[in-house]
Amino acid sequence: THCDYDWTKSDLNLNEYLVGLDNQRIITYDNSFNTLQMYSRYRIMFPNSITKGFKVSGNYIITILNNNQEVVFSRKFILYEELVNVPMLVKNPRDVRDLYSKHNLEFYVKPANIALQNPVQNVKIVLLKNDIWHTAIMNIKPMYTLGTDLYYKYDKETQFWAGNEFLYFEN
């Protein structure tokens, strides 16, 4: 299922984002051996002979159903296209209290060959640390624009807790 920025189902019809069919049986699996807990590991790859590919990039949710068409689980994934450049710096926080516990991200969105319509409203930024969505930083508006470039040079809004990944930056 194709989704919008906030992971709600988009208005696109299936044939607008997918080449092929979306309802297929997963037939590739391996059973566990020499384990205390028995399990099966299922695999599916895209594109394949039934689902030939995707027409648009964006957020997707794959939903796995059992034989009774009940949801077993679902997973989010993102299909990326490199349409803009995003130079980024990881810096020390400006607040001394956060100096040894957080990292600050400064970046800007530099559209290469595409025209952005109302970019302050339409460009959606999500900052992920190690692909962990529950700590994602979202809904950041640019601090300022220069030409077509959108600049994000905040002191607090783009900070992550460093945790075990803390790096000391010495300039």
Language-model features and meaning:
Residues 79-102:
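Low-complexity, Pro/Ser/Thr- and charge-rich linker/hinge segments at domain boundaries
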Residues 41-47, 145-160:
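Exposed aromatic-hydrophobic patches
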Residues 25-30, 43-48, 90-94:
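Short structured motifs
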Residues 5-7, 50-52, 65-72, 132-133:
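Short acidic/polar inter-strand loop motif in beta-rich domains
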Residues 36-65:
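Ligand-binding face of N-terminal immunoglobulin V-set domains in extracellular IgSF glycoproteins
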